[in-house]
């Protein structure tokens, strides 16, 4: 066993054991074990051009959607297809933390719907979800097709580059961050704004960062774990359950 790895995990367990109000803030890295492509990792989507011509940020912009819908739809189908994806151990660990009563809210930058599929109840989607599509003409919920039965254009219920976030979701996310005594941030480089800015509203005691690369908040964190999100959270929940069922845990 890796003693340093275990030491970090046990430290997180100790923090969660004394946590009353946990909020989770996650990015693409929380879903990579489910088959979702990362964005800014070394092999992420943003490292390559689509059709050797378009930057992903360009394709996923509001302007591009309206001017090149066919290319936009093909890109989403090829690179952002969420059909058949299943929650990983990290997602399921968050469900267990919610059942235990520690986790109060999941704030996600992801658009894959995996937190809801896994069973989390209070999920705040900052960027929307690819599971939902709607008609721009009649507003009716629609299938993932080019047009609605009314003849209108259909688009995904996600925030594209150049668009504002849903303010009601933002307000609730800020409220949850303000209430938390512990915040776990995982699977995100914290470079996407304005979403990353909202962490400034956290005033709690414990900021935990779980990521495979450095973030701008590492220096402010109580604990930084550079490891796989799914592995860490699965281990943490198993150790917490040992405590819950009266088993002793070394160093806790």
From Swiss-Prot:
Cofactor: record remark: Binds 1 zinc ion per subunit.
Major enzyme class: transferase
GO molecular function, one term: histone deacetylase activity, NAD-dependent
Domain Deacetylase sirtuin-type: start-end pairs: 2-243
Binding-site residues for NAD(+), renumbered to this chain: 28, 32, 39-40, 109, 111-112, 127, 188-189, 211
Binding site for Zn(2+): 135, 138, 148, 150
Cofactor: Zn(2+)
Alphabetized UniProt keyword annotations: Cytoplasm, Metal-binding, NAD, Transferase, Zinc
Family per record: Belongs to the sirtuin family. Class U subfamily.
Physiological role: NAD-dependent protein deacetylase which modulates the activities of several enzymes which are inactive in their acetylated form.
Protein name per Swiss-Prot or TrEMBL: NAD-dependent protein deacetylase
């Amino acid at each position: 066993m890796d003693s340093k790895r275990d030491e970090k995990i046990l430290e997180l367990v100790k923090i969660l054991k004394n946590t009353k109000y946990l909020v989770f803030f996650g990015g693409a890295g929380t879903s990579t074990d489910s088959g979702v492509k990362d964005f800014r990792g070394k092999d992420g989507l943003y490292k390559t051009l689509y059709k050797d011509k378009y930057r992903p940020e360009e394709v996923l912009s509001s302007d591009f959607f309206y001017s090149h819908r066919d290319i936009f739809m093909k890109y989403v189908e090829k690179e952002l297809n969420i059909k058949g994806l299943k929650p990983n151990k990290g997602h399921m660990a968050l469900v267990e933390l919610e059942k235990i009563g520690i986790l109060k809210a999941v704030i996600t930058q992801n658009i894959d719907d995996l937190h809801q599929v896994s069973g989390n109840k209070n999920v705040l989607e900052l960027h929307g979800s690819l599971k939902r599509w709607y008609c721009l003409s009649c507003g009716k919920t629609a299938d993932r097709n080019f047009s609605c039965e009314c003849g209108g254009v259909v688009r995904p219920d996600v925030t594209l580059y150049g668009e504002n976030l849903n303010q009601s979701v933002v307000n609730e996310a800020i409220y949850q961050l303000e209430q938390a005594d512990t915040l776990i941030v995982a699977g995100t480089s914290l470079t996407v704004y304005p979403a990353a800015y909202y962490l400034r509203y956290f005033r709690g005691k414990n900021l935990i960062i779980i990521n495979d690369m450095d973030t701008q908040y590492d220096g402010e964190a109580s604990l930084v774990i550079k490891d796989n999100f799914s592995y860490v959270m699965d281990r943490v929940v198993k150790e917490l359950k040992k405590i819950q069922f009266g088993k002793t845990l070394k160093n806790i």
